[in-house]
Amino acid sequence: MPKRTLQGVVVSDKQAKTVVVRVDRRFTHPIYKKTIRRSKNYHAHDESNEFKPGDMVWIEESKPISKLKRWTVVRGEHKKTA
């Protein structure tokens, strides 16, 4: 079975080798037919402490690394600075 991959934005990098990634999803409400946005935060392993808040990253499922970490950062794009 292939590993799931999600795309999100880094919201925190305060932990060592860990980033918190916000993943947004959109769906249509089954009764009201309105498009709704929901988000969820995932703790992901960042071995090189490379990513900072605002960066776009892709995370992939992995075996449990700690109590909260079950995802690993695969690749990312750094936020453009002016």
From Swiss-Prot:
GO MF term set: rRNA binding; structural constituent of ribosome
Matching entries from Pfam families are given as:
Ribosomal_S17 (PF00366)
Concerning InterPro entries, the annotation shows: NA-bd_OB-fold (IPR012340), Ribosomal_uS17 (IPR000266), Ribosomal_uS17_bact/chlr (IPR019984), Ribosomal_uS17_CS (IPR019979)
Where does the record place a coiled coil? Answer: none
Per UniProt, the keywords (alphabetical) are:
Ribonucleoprotein, Ribosomal protein, RNA-binding, rRNA-binding
GO BP terms, alphabetized? translation
User: What is a single cellular component term in the Gene Ontology annotation?
Assistant: cytosolic small ribosomal subunit
Which Gene3D superfamilies does the record associate with it?
Answer: Nucleic acid-binding proteins
UniProt xrefs under PROSITE patterns = RIBOSOMAL_S17 (PS00056)
Cited HAMAP family:
Ribosomal_uS17_B
Q: Which family does it belong to?
A: Belongs to the universal ribosomal protein uS17 family.
Summarizing the function annotation, the protein's role is: One of the primary rRNA binding proteins, it binds specifically to the 5'-end of 16S ribosomal RNA.
Note the NCBIfam families from the entry: PRK05610.1, uS17_bact
How does the annotation summarize its subunit structure?
Part of the 30S ribosomal subunit.
Instruction: Identify this protein by name.
Output: Small ribosomal subunit protein uS17
Q: What is the lineage of its organism?
A: Bacteria, Pseudomonadati, Pseudomonadota, Alphaproteobacteria, Hyphomicrobiales
